[in-house]
UniProtKB/Swiss-Prot annotation:
The gene is rpoA. The lineage of its organism: Bacteria, Bacillati, Actinomycetota, Actinomycetes, Mycobacteriales. Homodimer. The RNAP catalytic core consists of 2 alpha, 1 beta, 1 beta' and 1 omega subunit. When a sigma factor is associated with the core the holoenzyme is formed, which can initiate transcription. This is DNA-directed RNA polymerase subunit alpha. Residues 241-350 are annotated as: Alpha C-terminal domain (alpha-CTD). It comes from the Bacteria. DNA-dependent RNA polymerase catalyzes the transcription of DNA into RNA using the four ribonucleoside triphosphates as substrates.
Length: 350
């Protein structure tokens, strides 16, 4: 099996809603393969929300005007196409806009229901004079890509319901380039630089994560043809490599107390890897292995960046009685009550 060095992904924030991602090192040729796939997916397949139709009080079609409103209906529709919204609902939802003149009508005047957010409230919609009044009902739906107004026209829709072009994609622009990068003596590896700009409804980071998830799902179809087929395997990250090395350590290197060490040895636990595969409950089932020994093991593993199988990631050694955070040492005799017939000085040998 061929093992490739695991690439790293870094993010640089260029501006609000714009980030530059760097993925390196990639096997020769994979920069363009990955860059093109991510770009096309980001631009076409990231889910979003948009206005699909509107109804303006007193208006029967888009080729008309509203009394007291500077903009005609066509201009109002064009402005509403730039509305940036997000919706948590899978079904269509309705928003309402009611404004009395004089003054400017903005997206901030729209009243969205729960689960729907307007992300550009400063956006201009219309201008009203002293006698102007604007009442609009807007339908918002979730989707992806671009859907023209003709496809949003529902059969049997009421008179006055005007379909709108829907731009669901929350991604505005994606560019990428591939540069050469060096790995040891080789200089033909690829470095992919991906520039992503989004609307306010999603961050570039979340958009890229969504694109990656979509591609994994689709490429998984090909993998399912033969899950045993040979391919290039990505090597572990530096942190994972450190953990792999730690798993091979004998428990002798943990410098455990004699009691804890002997209990684990009797149970057949000889390496750190075998130890982290156990839960606290598993260890408590070992004869003479109590809470004090559990705390000791958790502290020793924490110093290696590891934990027991069911230990929470928020484990704090300083909360354990007898632990000195300044020196990283633990007093095994502090803060524990002895149980009946229990001697912590026991030095039972195998």
């Amino acid at each position: 099996m061929l093992i490739s060095q695991r690439p790293t992904l870094s993010e640089e924030t260029v501006a609000d809603n714009r980030s530059r991602f760097v993925i390196e090192p990639l096997e020769p040729g994979f920069g363009y393969t990955l860059g093109n796939s991510l770009r096309r997916t980001l631009l076409s397949s990231i889910p979003g929300a948009a206005v699909t139709s509107i109804r303006i009080d007193g208006v029967l079609h888009e080729f008309t005007t509203v009394p007291g409103v500077k903009e005609d209906v066509t201009d109002i529709i064009l402005n509403l196409k730039s509305l940036v919204v997000s919706s948590e609902e899978d079904e269509p939802v309705t928003m309402y806009l009611r404004k009395q003149g004089p003054g400017e009508v903005t997206a901030g005047d729209i009243v969205p229901p729960a689960g729907v957010t307007v992300h550009n409230p400063e956006m201009h919609i219309a201008t009203l004079n002293d006698k102007g009044k604007l009442e609009v009902e807007l339908v918002v739906e979730r989707g992806r890509g671009y859907v023209p107004a003709v496809q949003n026209k529902a059969s049997g829709a009421e008179i006055g319901r005007i379909p709108v072009d829907s731009i669901y994609s929350p991604v505005l622009k994606v560019t990428y380039k591939v540069e050469a990068t060096r790995v040891e003596q080789r200089t033909d590896f690829d470095k992919l630089i991906l520039d992503v700009e989004t609307k306010n409804s999603i961050t570039p980071r979340d958009a890229l994560a969504s694109a990656g998830k979509t591609l994994v799902e689709l490429f998984g179809l090909a993998r399912e043809l033969n899950v045993e087929a040979e391919g290039i395997e990505i090597g572990p990250s530096p942190a994972e490599a450190d953990h792999i090395a730690s798993f091979a350590l004998p428990i002798d290197d943990l410098d455990l107390t004699v009691r804890s060490y002997n209990c684990l040895k009797r149970e057949g636990v000889h390496t750190v890897g075998e130890l982290v595969a156990r839960t606290e409950s598993d260890l408590l089932d070992i004869r003479n292995f109590g809470q004090k020994s559990i705390d000791e093991v958790k502290i020793k593993l924490h110093q290696l960046g590891l934990s027991l199988k069911d230990s929470p990631a928020t484990f704090d050694p300083s909360e354990v009685a007898g632990y000195d955070a300044a020196t990283g040492t633990w007093n095994s005799d502090a803060g524990y009550d002895l149980e009946d017939n229990q001697d912590y000085a026991e030095t039972e040998q195998l």
